[in-house]
């Protein structure tokens, strides 16, 4: 496991309360973060507090079954260590550095402490570069920073893990450096599926995976992020390679810290969180940095409890990120995948000096159009689309086409949706948005833009409709000049405007409501 045994220093278990163990040492008192072993090395503990000159309080990193009062505990003399080096590539580890992929024994690695200081300010790089993901809505509206930190915020079941897995699929193949996936308190099934997918895709040779699953003690979940960063720092500082660090889920790190804090008897703060949450999160996040030798780019899934973005865990995480990608349950229910809310999401890279004047101008125009549509939705729901001015109706048409163009079929969900995955370059994504804003596709049905890659696919997906047909969306105004036909056959107008093109249901509530209005 990588721990170096020091001269024997034995202690005795005084009390066991769940994962917290009090131990008495009569000779040398172990220092903070020292690893202790009991029950013939099967039970691993980490010292978190020194009560007095004889007693320490430790948190268990393994289950404590079999541990009893009076049992001997051995001081290993060192902290928790992680394996670093080329021998760790293509392997899967637990928090102790043990391989869990049933492959050959580990070789060609060094062992380093997981407790390391962030790089000093003098070593940090201030150069700003864009990191392309191949996902249209992210690259256009909230570009990621090379060497930065991006968070995927969302409640349960809105697609955080799917989006993170798709980014792995898209970026690991074109990313020249090393990728590390760190699973903190997530499902064992997801780790197994990810390992198999990466192996089949042929990207495992440049990837390291490390897990502490939700069934493990809070101490293990609390330390696995530090172990992953230790591995990433080796490739950045020693190998001078760029790193891609993917964390699922950073909230589970905070949650594990809350459990540890409660077990240690600390006074809780707001909503039961630990009083040291800000310090603990900073100790992890500040190690993710862009230096003169290389960069660690991090993408982190962040679970938001009960979709409450004012939760202290979400608020503290927001402050460390260069890009915040917010996933919306409403958009997911409408079938607009990826369910990213373009108005709540943001990136500090979206400035003219970094992305260029054209990209910045297009992004602002897209946000403005979508924001106007969001304001008009209440009026449409109450009065109908025909009560809007012609200019507002054009805004609604552009916004709905933009929303559908910014959907994208994922490689990782092909087997569920039936749509073949698409990887779209930033240039193609910008061209598509620009052409929609110029009303180049106003004669195409909205469904032609749904779940496509580049904008040219829309032309092959659906031919422009005949101009005089009452069921077409762009002829709706003319068709309703005479209210009688609409009143006589309201049902006919509902399915006509938007023929479905995929497995997911298309959101057509606005137009369906409009037909009954007249």
From Swiss-Prot:
Gene Ontology molecular functions: ATP binding; ATP hydrolysis activity; proton-transporting ATP synthase activity, rotational mechanism; proton-transporting ATPase activity, rotational mechanism
Keyword Transport among record annotations: yes
Catalytic activity line of the entry: ATP + H2O + 4 H(+)(in) = ADP + phosphate + 5 H(+)(out)
EC class (word): translocase
Composition bias, Basic and acidic residues: 473-485, 507-518
Ranges that cross the membrane: none
Binding site residues for ATP: 154-161
InterPro entries reported in the protein's UniProt record: AAA+_ATPase, Alt_ATPase_F1_bsu, ATP-synt_VA_C, ATP_synth_F1_bsu, ATPase_a/bsu_AS, ATPase_alpha/beta_chains, ATPase_F1/V1/A1_a/bsu_N, ATPase_F1/V1/A1_a/bsu_N_sf
Region described as Disordered: spans on this chain: 455-518
SUPFAM superfamilies documented for this protein: C-terminal domain of alpha and beta subunits of F1 ATP synthase, N-terminal domain of alpha and beta subunits of F1 ATP synthase, P-loop containing nucleoside triphosphate hydrolases
EC number: 7.1.2.2
Cross-referenced Pfam families: ATP-synt_ab, ATP-synt_ab_N, ATP-synt_VA_C
Database matches in PANTHER family: ATP SYNTHASE, ATP SYNTHASE SUBUNIT BETA, MITOCHONDRIAL
Record family assignment: Belongs to the ATPase alpha/beta chains family.
HAMAP family named in the record: ATP_synth_beta_bact
Subunit annotation: F-type ATPases have 2 components, CF(1) - the catalytic core - and CF(0) - the membrane proton channel. CF(1) has five subunits: alpha(3), beta(3), gamma(1), delta(1), epsilon(1). CF(0) has three main subunits: a(1), b(2) and c(9-12). The alpha and beta chains form an alternating ring which encloses part of the gamma chain. CF(1) is attached to CF(0) by a central stalk formed by the gamma and epsilon chains, while a peripheral stalk is formed by the delta and b chains.
UniProt name for this protein: ATP synthase subunit beta 2
Upper taxonomic lineage: Bacteria, Pseudomonadati, Pseudomonadota, Betaproteobacteria, Burkholderiales
């Amino acid at each position: 496991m990588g721990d170096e045994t020091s001269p024997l220093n034995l202690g005795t278990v005084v009390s066991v309360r769940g994962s917290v163990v009090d131990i008495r040492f009569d000779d040398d008192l172990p220092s903070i973060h020292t690893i202790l072993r009991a029950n013939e090395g099967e039970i691993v503990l980490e010292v978190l507090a020194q009560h007095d000159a004889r007693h320490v309080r430790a948190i268990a990193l393994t289950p404590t079954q079999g541990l009893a009062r009076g049992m001997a505990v051995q001081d290993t003399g060192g902290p928790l260590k992680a394996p670093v080096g080329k021998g760790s590539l293509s392997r899967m580890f637990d928090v102790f550095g043990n391989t869990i992929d049933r492959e050959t024994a580990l070789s060609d690695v060094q062992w380093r402490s997981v407790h390391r200081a962030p790089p000093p300010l003098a070593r940090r790089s201030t150069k700003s570069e864009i990191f392309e993901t191949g996902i249209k809505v992210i690259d256009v509206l909230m570009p990621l920073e090379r060497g930065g930190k991006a968070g995927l915020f969302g409640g349960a079941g809105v697609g955080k893990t799917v989006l993170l897995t798709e980014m792995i699929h898209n970026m690991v193949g074109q990313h020249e450096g090393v990728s590390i996936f760190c699973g903190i308190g997530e499902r064992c099934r997801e780790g197994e599926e990810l390992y198999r997918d990466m192996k089949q895709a042929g990207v495992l040779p440049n990837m390291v995976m490390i897990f502490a699953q939700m069934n493990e003690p809070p101490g293990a979940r609390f330390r696995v992020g530090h172990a992953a960063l230790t591995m990433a720092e080796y490739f950045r500082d020693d190998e001078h390679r760029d790193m891609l660090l993917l964390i699922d889920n950073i909230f589970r790190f905070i949650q594990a810290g809350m459990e540890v804090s409660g077990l240690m008897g600390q006074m809780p703060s707001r909503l039961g969180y630990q009083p040291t949450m800000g310090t603990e999160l900073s100790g992890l996040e500040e190690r993710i940095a862009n230096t003169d030798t290389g960069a660690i780019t991090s993408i982190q899934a962040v679970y938001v409890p009960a979709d409450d973005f004012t939760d202290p865990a979400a608020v503290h995480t927001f402050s460390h990120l260069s890009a915040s990608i917010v996933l919306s349950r409403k958009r997911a229910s409408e079938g607009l995948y990826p369910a990213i809310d373009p108005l709540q999401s943001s990136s500090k890279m979206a400035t003219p000096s970094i992305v260029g004047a054209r990209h910045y101008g297009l992004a602002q125009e897209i946000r403005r159009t979508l924001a106007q549509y969001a304001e008009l939705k209440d009026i449409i729901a109450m009065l109908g689309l025909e009560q809007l001015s012609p200019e507002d109706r054009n805004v609604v048409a552009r916004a709905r086409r933009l929303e559908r163009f910014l959907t994208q079929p994922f490689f990782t969900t092909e087997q569920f949706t039936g749509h073949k995955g698409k990887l779209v370059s930033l240039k193609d994504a910008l061209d598509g948005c620009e052409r929609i804003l110029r009303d180049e596709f106003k004669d195409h049905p909205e469904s032609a833009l749904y779940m496509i890659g580049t904008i040219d696919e829309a032309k092959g997906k659906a031919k422009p409709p005949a101009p005089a047909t009452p069921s077409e969306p762009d002829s709706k105004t003319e068709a309703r000049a005479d209210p009688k036909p609409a009143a006589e056959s309201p049902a006919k107008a509902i399915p006509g405007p938007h023929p479905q093109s995929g497995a997911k249901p298309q959101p057509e509530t606005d137009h369906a409501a409009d037909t009954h209005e007249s």
